[in-house]
Regions:
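Glycine-rich adenosine-cofactor-binding loop
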Residues: 121-137
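N-terminal ligand-binding/catalytic initiation module
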Residues: 1-119, 123-125
């Protein structure tokens, strides 16, 4: 049987991500990411988790963070270079790839710097809900 799948990779630039956040709203984006994080925690055992790989230098760190489930493989590349501000660059920059496990076909290549900040806020919300006393407001 022939598996004729079309090769189609979506690319999201930093401007594309900003446009989505502006259109949907920052609060809605954080809430949506928090919801997805909570759903993924419920299926934690389904993930093939690998330790992040880090490359340290005197100027900063570059990390590669891979993860997969039965259908998708993903990684995030993120750096932390505190002195970048001297050159007008962000101290943290990130991008990532989402690929089909069966074929290795990249489905998404995305700039993730803003998404990383949103995920950090969403994770804080998830943790606050999990640790809050019952009936807390």
């Amino acid at each position: 049987m022939s598996r004729n799948k079309r090769l189609s990779t979506v690319y999201l630039s930093a401007n594309d991500v900003i446009e989505v956040v502006n259109r949907v709203g920052l609060s809605a984006c954080i809430a949506g990411v928090a919801e997805r994080i909570e759903r993924d925690f419920l299926r934690w055992q389904e993930f093939d988790k690998s330790a992040r790989v880090a490359c340290h230098s005197p100027e900063g760190v570059i990390e590669l963070m891979p993860i997969a489930d039965a259908n998708e493989f993903s990684f995030k590349y993120v750096n932390g270079h505190p002195k970048n501000t001297h050159d007008g660059l962000p101290t943290v920059m990130a991008f990532g790839v989402l690929a089909d496990v069966d074929t290795g076909t990249p489905r998404l290549l995305s700039e993730l710097t803003l998404t990383t900040a949103i995920r950090t806020a969403a994770m804080s919300a998830v943790a606050a809900r999990a640790l809050a006393r019952p009936n807390a407001r």
